[in-house]
Amino acid sequence: MPNAIFRSVMTPLDESELAPPGAIGEGGISNGLYSIHLKILDGLPGGLSGVMLLNNGRILGGDAFFYYLGSYSSSNGRWKGQMVNQEHTPARGEDPVFGGHEIGIGFSGTCDAEGGTLEGTALAGKRSIRFEAELKLICAA
């Protein structure tokens, strides 16, 4: 979008403040671009869909309102990691899953050559939100 002005709702995340990339072993999740579909658990409404780029232990991704950065490790069909999620465009009039907070997320799950699943917990203000997600490989890197 030429000449478009974008404003961050919060201070932009700095990659230097994140945990270092994790180790990737045999049978670990593949580097590439994934679609991600997240569902909130514990009977709470909500979910989201977006994209996630996995590259040598580093996570980058987002959707229409949020972006996230993080790190992961993976081997033998398992993976785990952590991310920080932040709003990049105000979600006014929407019902965002994470409601305008900077969110810390921890997760673990399974993976194969085509994608992965995960269960995680997001810490949003004083709330802890459990979720599950499915990733499907769109393009290998």
Which residues does each PLM region occupy?
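Tryptophan-anchored aromatic micro-motifs
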Residues: 2-44, 118
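Contiguous, well-ordered beta-strand patches that form the walls/edges
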Residues: 2-3, 64-115
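Short, solvent-exposed coil/turn segments at beta-strand boundaries
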Residues: 29-33, 51-60, 74-78, 109-116, ...
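Short, solvent-exposed secondary-structure boundary motifs
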Residues: 35-44, 57-65, 96-102
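Residue-level signal for secondary-structure boundary sites
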Residues: 42-44, 89-91, 128, 141
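N-terminal glycine/threonine-rich, aromatic-flanked beta-hairpin/loop signature
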Residues: 44-86, 120-121, 125-127
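Well-ordered beta-strand positions in beta-sheet-rich domains
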Residues: 49-51, 69, 104-108, 130-134
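Short, compact, well-ordered microdomains
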Residues: 112-136
